[in-house]
Design a protein with these regions (language model features):
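Residues within membrane-spanning alpha-helices of integral membrane proteins
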Residues: 3, 53, 108-112, 116, ...
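Small-residue-rich hydrophobic segments that form or flank transmembrane alpha-helices
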Residues: 3-85, 89, 93, 146-153, ...
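Residues that define the loop-to-transmembrane-helix transition and helix capping
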Residues: 46, 76, 102-105, 180, ...
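Transmembrane helix exit motif
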Residues: 59-70, 109-134, 231-232, 254-265
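Loop-to-transmembrane alpha-helix entry segments
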Residues: 98-111, 124, 241-244, 263
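Membrane-water interface at loop-to-transmembrane-helix junctions
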Residues: 135-151
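Interfacial loop-to-transmembrane junctions
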Residues: 230-251
Length: 265
């Protein structure tokens, strides 16, 4: 029965990543901890986070390729926050190992539901005067890169989740990127963030790879496939459709994860 939940968790994670750049751990970690007995125990959450981060690498990579092919990515304004997030994610991974069993924070889950409702109410997030792709970083963006990149990076390494969702908010609301561009840039950053954080988790606790390599391989394949399909869908439809689907996905996933975290547990 556990293998069924592995597939469901990876499928949900892949759809979330390809559609809105959602961190795989936001979906996978609570499901693995609550529904899969093999992820219980002192290092259960740490192992679940490592599996989710590993699933995020190729899932984010194929999504990034799809968004980049449609020119929905902006690296000139995203490089600085990316560098900061990468450094802090490695630090967060080490801190997570020192603190032991950490369960996904409730704030991220509530935030996911709120953002989902926001997209349902206002699905078309396109601005009248969006910032053009390739515009150089201004002082405001530099300050925001440090102010937002430090907590996002540390949080991604620490609990493996929240990075994609919070990056989407920062890039769209504060950097002025259009929704698809924000998602494409976010998944690009998450590709390397997940790689650094996953490698850090495994190097700090090598037993994860030897004990969970089969689970990790299955989740990577399922999440990557789901991410590719959902990313292609997102880039072929208009912003309103993406917004509506995003709203439904985030609201349903957020409510489901809250139930798993607080009612089931």
């Amino acid at each position: 029965m556990e293998w069924f939940w592995y597939i469901i968790a990876a499928l949900g994670a892949g759809v979330g990543t390809g559609l809105v750049g959602l961190s795989a751990a936001t979906v996978m970690v609570p499901m693995l901890i609550v529904l899969c007995p093999s992820f219980t125990g002192e290092t259960g959450a740490y192992q679940a986070t490592a599996v989710a981060l590993a699933s995020d690498i190729l899932g984010s990579a194929v999504a990034t390729y799809t968004y980049a092919k449609h020119k929905n990515i902006d690296l000139k304004r995203g490089w600085l926050i990316m560098a900061i997030i990468l450094i802090m994610s490695a630090i967060g991974s080490y801190a997570a190992f020192l603190t032991g069993n950490v369960v996904l924070g409730g704030f991220t889950l509530i935030l996911t539901v709120c953002i989902g409702i926001r997209f349902l109410v206002k699905p078309d997030s396109a601005k009248k005067n969006p910032v053009k792709n390739g515009t150089k970083l201004g002082l405001k963006e530099v300050i925001l890169s440090f102010a937002c990149g430090i907590p996002i990076g540390f949080g991604t390494g620490f609990v493996g989740s929240g990075g994609g969702m919070t990056m989407l908010i920062v890039l769209s609301a504060f950097f002025g990127m259009e929704l698809k561009t924000a998602v494409g840039t976010s998944t690009f950053i998450m590709t390397f963030t997940a790689l650094i954080a996953s490698a850090s988790h495994i190097m700090i606790h090598p037993a994860i790879f030897f004990e969970k390599w089969d689970v990790m391989l299955l989740c990577i394949v399922v999440a990557t496939t789901a991410s590719l399909v959902s990313a292609r869908f997102a880039n072929r439809v208009n912003n309103r459709t993406v917004g509506l689907v995003t709203g439904v996905v985030l609201t349903v996933l957020g409510i489901a994860m809250i139930i798993l975290n607080y009612w089931v547990m």
